[in-house]
Amino acid sequence: MKKILIISGGISKERAISLDTGRQVAKELKKNNYFVKIAEPNFQLFDVIKKFKPNKIFNALHGQFGEDGYIQTILESFKIPYTHSGVISSSIAMDKVLSKKIFIKNKILTPKFLTFSFSKDEKNIVRTIEKKLKFPVVIKPINEGSSVNVFICTKKDIKKKLKYLEDYKKIIIEEFIGGREIQAAIIGSKKLGAIELKPKRKFYDYQAKYNPKAKTEHIIPVDLPKKKYKQIMKISSKAHN
C-alpha cells in the first residue's frame, strides 16, 4: 500500500480552507486504498517525513508558505515527489505583479494595474487612479490567494476599503473588467477544460468560493462557441507554461 503524506494548515490567511482541502483529499485517497497521514508544516514536519517515509507528498497548503516556493524548497530537499508546481514557478505565480509583468512581456492580455504603497501613496491614491486607470478598480494583496481581501472599489469607497489591507506593505490596484467568470484547468502540458462560475454575490470573492450558502453556480461544460473555447484554453496554456 502506497503512503501519501498530506501537508495542510499552515500560517496563511487561508489556513481554514487548507485544512478542509487536506481532509477532503485524505477522504478520497483512503477510498482508493492509500495509507494516508496529515501533517502541519511546522518544526515537526522533518521528523514526520523521516518516520512516515511517504511515497509521495500531497501539498494541500493554500497561500503564503504553501504556494509561493517556500514549502516547495523544503520538499525538494527530501527528494520525494510532491504535488504542485516547482520552486521557481510557485514563487513567480504567487506574486501577482511579477506574473503580470511576465504576461505583458509575452503579449498575454492582463488588466492595467499599478502598485500601491501605504507609506508613500495613500494621500494621492484617488488622483493617481484617475490619472492612470479609472474607477471602479479592483484592490488586492500582491501575494494572497482565494480572493482574500479582494475588493471592487468606487471613487467614493476606495479609502474605506484600503483600510482592510493596511497590514500589507504593498498591494496591487487593477482596472475592473466586467463579464463572465471562466476558469481553465491546466496540469503540466495537458488542458483539462474550462468551467463557468456564476456567483450570486457581487463577484467571485472568498465567500462565493467557500461558503455553501453563497450558492455559486458551477457550469460544466462551459457554454461557449468552439472558437472562443479554444482561444481561452490556448491563452490559459500559454500563461501556465
Task: Please tell me what each predicted stretch does.
Residues 2-8, 20, 36, 49-51, ...:
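Active-site nucleotide/adenylate-binding loops and adjacent lid/helix of ATP-dependent enzymes
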Residues 38, 59, 84, 112-115, ...:
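Structural signal for conserved beta-strand scaffold positions within catalytic alpha/beta enzyme cores
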Residues 45, 87, 150-153, 206, ...:
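Short clusters of hydrophobic/aromatic residues that line enzyme substrate/ligand-binding pockets
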Residues 237-241:
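Short, basic/aromatic recognition patches
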Residues 154-234:
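Phosphate-binding site of ATP-dependent enzymes
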Residues 1-94, 98, 117-126:
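ATP-binding N-terminal substructure of ATP-dependent carboxylate-amine bond-forming enzymes
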